[in-house]
UniProtKB/Swiss-Prot annotation:
Subcellular compartments: Plastid, Chloroplast membrane
GO MF terms, alphabetically ordered: L-ascorbic acid transmembrane transporter activity; phosphate transmembrane transporter activity
Similarity comment: family membership: Belongs to the major facilitator superfamily. Sodium/anion cotransporter (TC 2.A.1.14) family.
Keyword annotations of the record: Chloroplast, Ion transport, Membrane, Plastid, Transit peptide, Transmembrane, Transmembrane helix, Transport
Organism from which the protein derives: Oryza sativa subsp. japonica
Residue numbers spanned by region Disordered: 1-38
PROSITE patterns per UniProt: MFS
Primary location class: plastid
Protein name: Probable anion transporter 4, chloroplastic
Function noted in UniProt: Probable anion transporter.
């Protein structure tokens, strides 16, 4: 967009030479001055007007089709002419803007706009003095379709003018003005949506598959656990690859890999059980790199002021992916058979990958279409360095905040995996819901987590924006993520009605989602250059907690009760709270 004030300093019959000065805006002030002229006492005078510019670069997409932004009343005006208080500016696509001082108090018509020639003003004298000396009574604005280059209009058509050019930015449709960093965030969101859709479809499809192939419960458990063989394998490796080769390459590889494994799952099942186990492990390999790669790419793209919101949005993609997978898998299976769910969900990965290759880059410095303004904004809150060539393991493992991440991730995932894995059994055996009701109620915690994760992200970024230290914000949010579930699981042992039990479950998972603005955001705080490796380390501990916690719950239930299961989780939540508040930090400890 180009903004300018078209000013005439005297009578329109007076010539205005091309020596009229054009000043770029500085400190939101625009200056326009005319060449020296002689007043009635033959003294040489120069008229200079300074305008205060307000918010012309901050108009929203809706305001782009309305009058927006303003030239304020002049701060300095060396002439005695009166100028009205506001100069309005219209901000429209592919239009150039001129603000006119109306000089015809009788006819009140627009001054006919002249064309610009590469931001210069070609002025010539008017042949005849057609205008009287005006008293400038108002300011008007008019937007026209303009050519950037072109010959000046005839001096008989337009008075001599001085053009002040304020700013030049290409105006484009709103979808092209959408911040590139949030485009990357949304693509990561959809990758995590697909991640959990492809993961949970087996939990539904395993029922007709076990009937068709005659699998025992032990075999079903083996198939379900085979995913974690590959998932554990690539947690740390995914972080190393992402920090070395870039998050775009690694995340793209992961989505393609697990999508192919998903599509090939029906074929592997029909060939034989060993092939199915290998295919599920392959799928785990692909999904294992997703979180470290995402953490790497967002550490470069998202400034700290937006970190919590962006990560909360991405992780809510996982929760909504579970909801989507649990909702659509039964429909596809009942209509087209169990293989259809693998074909349908797996094929979506190719659509995502095409968009990823076109729109995403590993860092802002690699994106040729990124605007200078957005690049400055991003670099103001993040650090871009050369790709990592070697991992300083000794340095990383010597830092207490790193161990705070690892221990807290373990404590967090123990309770989370227990609730999400054993919840249908609890609803069925303890609360006496039937299988259909249990399945529907299992969706509720995922929805609750998706909602509260984004609420927590907004709160965290708001606190950071208001000057609260990042360390305190991370400790506050993670304390909620630990103590909230501990409180509601304790209450769960006391309630006597199914409705209250379901409410406690939902509140437990909702408060758990505040962890996305706590420990899940902290990897980028303490070591943005090694964000992928750090998440790989802590998430390895988290996955191990899920595996051991799920198995331990079965053992506890054989010897004890559900109260004992919840008590173990509560103890670990409290341990995690203490470790986190003592050893964690929001400051960078790894360069």
């Amino acid at each position: 967009m180009a903004m300018g004030a078209v000013l005439s300093s005297r009578t329109f019959a007076s010539p205005l030479s091309s020596s009229g000065k054009q000043h770029p805006p500085q400190n939101n002030k625009c200056t326009c001055s005319s060449p020296p002229t002689r007043d009635k006492f033959s003294r040489l005078t120069t008229r200079t007007t300074i305008f205060q510019v307000s918010n012309y670069s901050r108009s929203t997409s809706m305001e782009r089709f309305q009058l927006s932004a303003r030239f304020h009343q002049p701060v300095v005006d060396s002439s005695t002419n009166y100028l009205t208080r506001w100069f309005y500016n219209a901000n429209l696509k592919r239009r150039r803007i001129e603000c006119f001082l109306t000089s015809d108090p009788i006819n009140t018509g627009w001054l006919k706009p002249r064309r610009w020639d590469n931001f210069t003003s070609l002025d010539t004298a008017c042949v005849q003095p057609d205008y009287k000396i005006p008293v400038r009574t108002r300011a008007d604005c008019k937007a026209e379709q303009y050519e950037i280059t072109g010959s000046p209009l005839s001096p008989s058509d337009v008075p001599a003018e001085a053009v002040l050019i304020g700013d030049t930015n290409e105006i484009s449709p709103w979808w092209q003005q959408f911040p590139k960093r949030w485009t990357v965030v949304l693509l990561c969101f959809f990758s995590f949506l697909l991640c959990n859709m492809d993961r949970v479809n087996m939990s539904i499809a395993i029922l007709p598959m076990s009937s068709e192939f005659g699998w025992s419960p032990a075999t079903v458990g083996l198939i379900q656990s085979s995913f974690f063989w590959g998932y554990l394998l690539t947690q740390i490796l995914g972080g190393i690859w992402a920090d070395r080769f870039g998050g775009k390459v690694v995340l793209g590889f992961g989505v393609v890999w697990w999508s192919i494994a998903t599509v090939l799952t029906p074929l592997a099942a029909k060939i034989g059980l060993p092939f199915l186990l290998v295919m599920r492990a392959f799928m785990g390999i692909g999904e294992g790199v997703a979180m470290p790669a995402m953490n790497n790419i967002l550490s470069k793209w998202v400034p700290v002021s937006e970190r919590s919101r962006s990560l909360a949005l991405v992780y809510s993609g996982m929760y909504l992916g579970s909801v989507t997978g649990l909702a659509f898998s039964p429909l596809l299976i009942s209509r087209f058979g169990w293989p259809s769910v693998f074909y349908a969900f797996g094929s979506l990965g190719s659509v995502w990958f095409a968009l990823w290759q076109r729109k995403a880059h590993s860092s802002p410095s690699e994106d040729p279409e990124l605007s200078k303004a957005e690049k400055r904004y991003i670099l103001g809150g993040s650090t871009l360095k050369e790709p990592v060539t070697s991992i300083p393991w000794k340095l990383i493992l010597s830092k207490p905040p790193v161990w705070a991440l690892i221990v807290s991730h373990f404590c967090h995932n123990w309770g989370t995996f227990i609730l999400l894995t054993w919840m249908p059994t609890y609803y069925n055996q303890v609360l006496k819901f039937n299988l259909t009701e249990s399945g529907l109620l299992c969706v509720l915690p995922w929805l609750t987590m998706a909602i509260f994760a984004n609420i927590g992200g907004w709160i965290a970024d708001t606190l950071v924006g208001r000057g609260v230290s990042i360390t305190n914000v991370r400790k506050i949010m993670q304390s909620i993520g630990f103590l909230g579930p501990a409180l509601f699981l304790t209450l769960l042992s006391k309630v006597r009605t199914p409705a209250m039990a379901v409410l406690c479950m939902a509140c437990s998972q909702g408060s758990d989602a505040f962890s996305q603005s706590g420990l899940y955001s902290n990897h980028q705080d303490i070591g943005p250059r090694y964000a992928g490796v750090l998440l790989g380390l802590s998430n390895t501990a988290g996955v191990l907690a899920g595996v051991f916690g799920t198995a331990a719950t079965g053992y506890i239930l054989q010897k004890g009760s559900w109260d004992s299961v919840f008590q173990v989780a509560v103890v670990l939540y409290i341990v995690g709270t203490v470790v986190w508040n003592v050893f964690s930090t929001g400051e960078k400890v790894l360069e």
